[in-house]
Amino acid sequence: MVTGDPVATKTPNAADSDDNDFTASMSHLTIGQQIQELSKQLQNTKEELHQQVRDKHGALLQQATHAGRFDAALNALAEDVQRVRETGHRLKNQVDTQYQQVENQTQVLGRLHDVSHLLRSAGTLLSLTAKLKATKDVLRLAEIHFELGQLIEDKELKDIDFIQQERAYVISSAQKIRNLTQMQLVTGLQERNENQVVNALKIFMNFNTLEKSLDNLLATFIADMEQSLKECFAGNDISVLNKSPTHNVSKPAPSRGPGKTPQLTTTQNFRAKFWKSLHWLLYDELFETCTQIKLLKTALEQINQFGYTSESSDQCIPQRFWQQVQQLLRKSFDECPQHVTQTLQEGLSKLLTSARGLEQRLHGEFQFDNELFAPLEVGYVSKCAANFKACLAGVDLPGNETVDNFIRVASTELSAALIDSRLTNAIANVFAACGKELCTKLEAQIKLGADSKQVVDLPNLQQQQNTQLANVLFYYKDSVRRMLSDLHVHFEKTPGTAREIISRSLEQADLLIGTILQQIMESIITTISIIVLSMHREPGLNSERMSTTGPSMYMKELQEFVNRSWSHHIALFDDKQMTKKCGHELAKRCIELFLHNVCILRPLSSCGRQRLKQDCQHMEQALKPLCPNLAELGKPSRLLRAMSLLIVQTAEELVKQTIGEDSLVPSYIVLLLLFGHAGADLQSPHTTANWSNERLIEWLDGHTAEREKLELISGALQRYRDNARRKNIQQYDEVYPMMVDYFEQALKALP
C-alpha cells in the first residue's frame, strides 16, 4: 500500500475545491488549449505514479511475497478437506451396514413378541372362558367379564379362528348377564331390596356400563312419567294410570299414536277425573319413583367405598332426576291443550296442594322450584280477581250483604291459596285491590258540606247516610279481621306478607270512617268553644252574693250539648274503637278550651271562684259520655282536677307551684291566673294587645310553644311597668313583683 503521498492526503473538501477551480479555468479556454492542458495534467499524474512506485518498491515486493505464501496454504487446506471427506464416506458405509443388520433383527424380534402376546392373550381368553363356564355366581361372572373385557375388544384376536367360538360365548354371556342384572336392578328398586340393588350396580361397574345403565334408568323413569302425564291430560280414568306398566328397562314402551281429543261427557266430569289422576300421579307415582331414587342413592354410597367415582355420584343422581322431572313438568304445562291449561290455571291451588304434599312425604329432600308454577299463576289470579269483582259488579252502594259475599269469596280463595306463600301473596294483593274498589264505591257516596256537619239538631238524611256508610265500612273491617283470625293458624304455617298486605288494605276504611267522623267532631268542637266562651258573660262571677252550689248556666248548656251530640251523632257509629278515640280527642279539646277560658276570666269574687271550682267538677261529669274513665286521658284529666284547686288559691299560693318539666300545670296557666288576682291597671295580655277573648283562645290554640306564650305575657308585664313609670306610680300592684319573679323562674326553666 502506498502511504504518505501529499496528493493522497488531501481532504475531500480540498479535492473538490481543486476540481471546481480547474473546471472554472478550463471553461474559459478553447478546445485545443483544453486538450493541451489535459495532456499536461495526465503527464503530471504519470510522473507522480512512477515516483510513488519507486518510493514504495520494498513494501510492494513484501506484499507480493505474502500473497504467494497464502495461496500455497489454501491449496494444502483443500487437500486435507478432501482426505477427511473420503474418510467420512468409509465410516458411513460401515455404520449403514451394521444398522441394517440390527434393524432386520429387531423386526424379527418384534414379530416374535407380537406372536407371543397373541398366544398369551388367546391362552388367557381360553382360560378365563373355561372359568366363566364353570362359575355360577353372578358377581364372580361379572369380575371374569371385567378381565375379559379388553381381550374381547382386541382387534387382533378377532382374526384368530380357533378362539372365535369362545369369543362368541363370552359376548353372549355378557349380554345375558347385563339383561338379567338390569331386571334385578329394577326389581330390587321396586321391592326395596338394597342388597340386590348394590349387587346389580357392582355388576354394571365390572362391565363398565354403570354410567349408561343409570342414564337408561333415569330415562325410563322420565318416560313413564311422561306417558302418565299424557294419559292424565287425555282425561283417562285413574284406573288406567294404576294399570300402566311398571318401570321395565329391558322392554321398551310400545309406541303410541298422537293423542286425540278426549270424549268427555261434561267439563265437570273431565276436571274431576283430571285432578284425581294428577293427584295420584304426583302424590303416589312420583313418590314411588323418588323413593326408588333415594334407595339408588344409598346403594351408590356403598359402592363408592370400592373407589367408584363419576358424574353419576350418589349426590348427582337425585339432582339429575329431579331436574329432569321439573323440566318434564314445565314442558308438559307449556305444551298441553288449551282446555288443560285452563284447568291447571283455575285449579292451581289443587296442584300446589299435591306438590306440597309430595314434598312433605319426602321430608323436603325434593323441592319444586317456585318458578315452575309461575306461568299458571296468571290465570289463577285472574280467575280469583274475577270472583272478587263479581261480588262488586253492578253494586253502586255496597251494603252488609255485599260485604258478606265479598268476604265469603275472599275466605275461600285465601284458604285454597294458603298452601303456597307466593300464591297467597298474589291473592292478598288482589284482595287489597278489590277491597280498595269497595271502599272507593262507598267513598263516592259520602256527603260533605254544611248539612253533613250540623250538630245542633237531630241527624239529617245526609248524616244518616254517612253513618250508614261508616257502619258498612266498619262491618267490612270487622269481617276482614275475623277472617284473618280464622285463618291465623294457616298464615303461621305459610311464611309471607299476605296477612300484612290485607291488614294494610284496611287503612283506607279507617281513613274514610275518620273523614266522616272528623267533620262532625269539628262542628262539635266549634260549638263547645262557643259555649265555653260564654262563661265570660256568666252573671254574678264578680259578686259575693251568688250561689256556689250547682253548675253555671254555660256548664248546664255544655252538659246538655255534649250528651245530645254524642248520643245523636257519634254513638250511632258501630266502630267503637274509632268513636272512643274521637271521644278522647273531644274530651282533651274540651278540657283545653275550658282551662284557657278559666285562666283568663276576670274579675272574679271569692264566690265566683268557688262556682268555677264546682264547674271543674261538673266538667268531669259533662265529659262522661265522651270518656267514661277520665283517667285514661292522662295529663289533661289531672290538669282539670288541678285547676279546681288553683282557681281558689291566693296569689301567694299560686307562685309556689312547681316550675319546669316535672310541673303538672304549665307556667303560662299560673301567670294568667295571677292576672285575675291583680288590679285593673295590670291588664291581661290580650287586653293589652286589644284582642278579644275569642282571639286569645285562637292564638293559644295556634301557638303551642311555652316560650311564645311567655313572650305574650312578658309584653303585658312590660306594658304595665312602662305605664307605671310614665304615671310616676310609687307602688306597683302587690301581685306584680310575684308575677315578675315567677316569670323569670319560668323563663330560666325553658329548655
From Swiss-Prot:
Gene Ontology cellular-component annotations: endoplasmic reticulum exit site; Golgi apparatus; Golgi membrane; Golgi transport complex
Pfam families listed in its UniProt record: COG5_C, COG5_N
GO biological process: acrosome assembly; actomyosin contractile ring contraction; intra-Golgi vesicle-mediated transport; male meiosis cytokinesis; meiosis I cytokinesis; meiosis II cytokinesis; meiotic spindle organization; protein transport
Keyword NAD found: no
This protein's record includes keyword Methyltransferase: no
Location, primary (coarse class): Golgi
Subunit description: Component of the conserved oligomeric Golgi complex which is composed of eight different subunits and is required for normal Golgi morphology and localization.
Described function: Required for normal Golgi function and necessary during spermatogenesis. Required for cleavage furrow ingression during cytokinesis in dividing spermatocytes and for the extensive polarized cell growth that accompanies spermatid elongation.
Biological source species: Drosophila melanogaster (Fruit fly)
PANTHER family assigned to the protein according to its UniProt record, in alphabetical order: CONSERVED OLIGOMERIC GOLGI COMPLEX COMPONENT 5, CONSERVED OLIGOMERIC GOLGI COMPLEX SUBUNIT 5
Location of the region described as Disordered in the Swiss-Prot/TrEMBL record: 1-21, 244-263
Topology of this chain in the membrane: Peripheral membrane protein
Protein name: Conserved oligomeric Golgi complex subunit 5
InterPro entries noted in UniProt: Cog5, COG5_helical, COG5_N
Domain of life: Eukaryota
Stated family: Belongs to the COG5 family.
Localization of this protein: Golgi apparatus membrane
Gene disruption phenotype: Males are sterile.
Annotated keywords: Developmental protein, Differentiation, Golgi apparatus, Membrane, Protein transport, Spermatogenesis, Transport
